[in-house]
């Protein structure tokens, strides 16, 4: 499904329920905008459904392509081209209990907010309206990048409430499939990572997840661990762009390139894809199994082959789970690998993204009936999930249309958490608390992490400065270079919830104050178990390392360098490999790209080529030292000894982005 430049533009999260929309990154002079919501939406019953009328949204650039009209859960959404009248007939389908009409305008920049109709109808009261048996309403519940966020927090829903919400959604529409776009595990809080991520898999089982693709973080550990995860999963692992699935099995359970599910008599084929950058994002060797190393294709050839195979087996609806994401908007155009895949994938009705931890929703009207495509991505850590309603015509054997809602924490506040899932979380939490709720010091505020773009992946950040300085102080090296992607939470950690309620923690939205920090915070921030490595490099090697750090998919990659002992500047508008402008010592003396030797501390992960640092450092000439997280903990303890409070360090200009 090839998209035009304008079609590859977007707005984040429209059709959202109780979730703030993501403001597109755009220049002040950007002439593009998403449509405003339509107005004057009225609804009234008719013989063959509920008629919905509205006043068109004001004209915008790009032009409005049409309107998505939905009746809510269990309904049959329809797409009305903007060239047609501003009226639609919503069929009432078997099993539907209410008709709650909403209308959204869509252009190639994205969706408007959903405008509600003046009336909502209980189907039981529509005695003169024909129930349209030829339509089947399907429901898809989807999340991505859960990263073991099992506990509820100020932002995360928590798996017990997710399980309760999904159970309620299934009750409202039994024709439901629950899916994940990957990164369920890895870079996770201790409640998951300390137990080899099995608590997350057990939670997903209780949530009745049906299928998941792999994300890069599913490979944070060895293939042996992946096999253990597969063995513990009651759901199907699906990936279509791996060179081999031979080693991805445990007993009778095995990963597949596709699987067909039957919902309300309709066969739904699910395919999946992981990001091809996984190899450089995980520890070298993690993709090697007994039969060899898995290669991950950067193209959709395998996915398209799986779609063809699924359709030959009878699949009537295709859902693609793609662990690729949206990154930003530039001059109205969407950026991110997800959209390269959208261009390549042929025959999918729904494409769910992931990986970049963003909220995104778009709609591609097809040229032929039944070829429209919903594209959606959801935020990480269980902050929200998507609920897509898809209408299938059993006579034409085509999808009529789809509509997606974003369900956030406030929207599920009234849902009863699932007791079994809550008990599971408590069981693991109780085992951790005595070790992890131990205070290591106090801080004067929150050391930030994340954002758009993520601070630790785009520039100098307090947590990066403090940690890099701590490493240099301990090992007395000239320089330190560590990857920003290794920082997985703020400090105190947002996703670590102490059992000890006496600890002083930041309230929602509060970033200043004196807060307790614990072992649990440290292990949540640095969950990978990396060790510090010391070695000797030349000035030329340092420049090479920095070019890699500001290359790749900057500012989305985890390779961005957090440094100590020197300064550097870069220009992100220059070609990859030529972005570093200057490198100097702290006193301003230039560091040339020559053979002058320096000592440096980094991580074993980087020494062995992780995050694109292939061939930069020599493993043979490197000494593996202490655990990275232990160095951090010791530094916090030292800085807070005698009751002192560790202040959030101000930026000192060690890293400068000139453009």
Model-derived regions: residue spans:
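Secretory targeting and sorting signals
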Residues: 1-28
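Pro/Thr/Ser/Gly-rich low-complexity, intrinsically disordered linker/stalk tracts
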Residues: 29-63, 109-127
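Hydrophobic beta-strand positions in extracellular immunoglobulin-like domains
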Residues: 56-58, 71, 105, 392
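Structural motif
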Residues: 64, 71, 263-264, 370, ...
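Recognizes extended acidic, P/S/T-rich segments that occur
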Residues: 66-96
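Beta-strand-rich modules
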Residues: 87-113
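Acidic, metal/ion-coordinating pockets
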Residues: 126-412, 458, 463-470, 552-553, ...
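Catalytic centers of hydrolytic enzymes
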Residues: 133-139, 148-151, 163, 168-171, ...
């Amino acid at each position: 499904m090839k998209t035009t430049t304008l079609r590859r533009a977007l707005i984040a999260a429209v059709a959202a329920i109780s979730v703030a929309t993501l403001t597109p990154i755009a220049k002040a002079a950007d002439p593009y905008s998403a449509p405003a919501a339509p107005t004057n939406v009225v609804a009234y019953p008719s013989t063959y459904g509920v008629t919905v009328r509205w006043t068109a949204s004001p004209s915008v650039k790009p032009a409005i392509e049409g309107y998505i009209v939905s009746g809510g859960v269990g309904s049959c959404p329809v797409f009305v081209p903007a060239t047609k009248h501003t009226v639609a007939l919503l069929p009432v389908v078997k099993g539907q209990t209410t008709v709650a009409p909403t209308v959204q305008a869509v252009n190639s920049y994205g969706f408007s907010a959903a405008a509600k109709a003046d009336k909502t109808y209980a189907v039981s009261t529509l005695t003169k309206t024909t129930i349209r048996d030829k339509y089947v309403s399907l429901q898809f519940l989807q999340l991505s990048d859960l990263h073991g966020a099992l506990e509820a927090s100020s932002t995360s829903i928590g798996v017990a409430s997710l399980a309760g919400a999904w159970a309620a959604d299934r009750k409202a529409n039994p024709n439901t499939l629950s899916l994940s776009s990957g990164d369920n595990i890895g870079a996770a809080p201790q409640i998951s990572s300390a137990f080899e991520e099995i608590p997350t898999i057990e939670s997903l089982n209780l949530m009745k997840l049906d299928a998941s693709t792999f994300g890069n973080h599913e490979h944070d550990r060895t293939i042996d661990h992946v096999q253990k995860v597969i063995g513990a999963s009651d759901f199907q692992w699906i990936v279509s762009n791996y060179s081999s699935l031979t080693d991805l099995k445990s007993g009778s359970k095995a990963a597949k390139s596709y699987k067909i599910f039957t919902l309300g008599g309709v066969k739904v084929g699910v395919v999946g894809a992981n990001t091809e950058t996984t190899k450089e994002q995980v520890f070298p060797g993690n993709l090697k199994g007994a039969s060899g190393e898995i290669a991950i294709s950067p193209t959709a050839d395998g996915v398209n082959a799986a779609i063809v195979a699924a359709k030959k087996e009878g699949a009537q609806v295709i859902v693609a789970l793609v662990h690729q994401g949206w990154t930003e908007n530039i001059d109205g155009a969407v950026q991110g690998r997800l959209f390269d895949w959208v261009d390549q994938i042929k025959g999918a009705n729904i494409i769910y993204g992931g990986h970049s931890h963003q909220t995104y929703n778009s709609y591609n009207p097809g040229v032929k009936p039944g070829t429209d495509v919903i594209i959606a991505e959801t935020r990480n850590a269980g902050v929200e999930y998507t609920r897509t309603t898809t209408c299938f015509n059993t006579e034409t054997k085509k999808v009529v249309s789809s509509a997606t809602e974003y369900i956030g924490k406030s929207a599920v506040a009234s849902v009863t958490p699932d007791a079994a899932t809550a008990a599971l979380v408590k069981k693991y939490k109780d085992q951790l608390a005595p070790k992890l709720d131990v205070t290591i010091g106090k801080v004067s505020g929150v050391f930030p992490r994340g954002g758009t773009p993520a601070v630790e992946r785009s520039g100098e950040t307090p947590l990066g400065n403090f940690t890099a300085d701590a490493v240099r102080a301990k090992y007395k090296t000239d320089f330190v270079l560590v990857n920003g992607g290794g920082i997985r939470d703020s400090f105190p950690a947002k996703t670590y919830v102490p059992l000890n309620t006496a600890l002083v923690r930041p309230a929602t939205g509060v970033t200043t104050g004196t807060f307790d920090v614990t072992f649990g915070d440290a292990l949540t921030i640095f969950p990978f178990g990396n060790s510090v490595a010391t070695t000797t490099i030349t000035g030329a090697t340092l420049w090479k390392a920095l070019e890699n750090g500001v290359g790749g998919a900057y500012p989305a990659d985890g390779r961005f360098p957090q440094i100590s002992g020197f300064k550097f500047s870069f220009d992100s508008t220059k070609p990859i490999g030529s972005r570093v402008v200057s490198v100097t010592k702290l006193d301003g003396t230039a560091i040339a790209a020559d053979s002058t030797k320096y000592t440096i501390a980094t991580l074993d992960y980087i020494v062995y080529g992780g995050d694109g640092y292939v061939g930069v450092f020599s493993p043979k000439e490197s000494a593996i030292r202490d655990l990275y997280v232990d160095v951090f903990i010791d530094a916090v303890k030292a800085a807070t000894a005698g009751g002192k409070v560790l202040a959030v360090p101000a930026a000192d200009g060690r890293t400068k982005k000139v453009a």
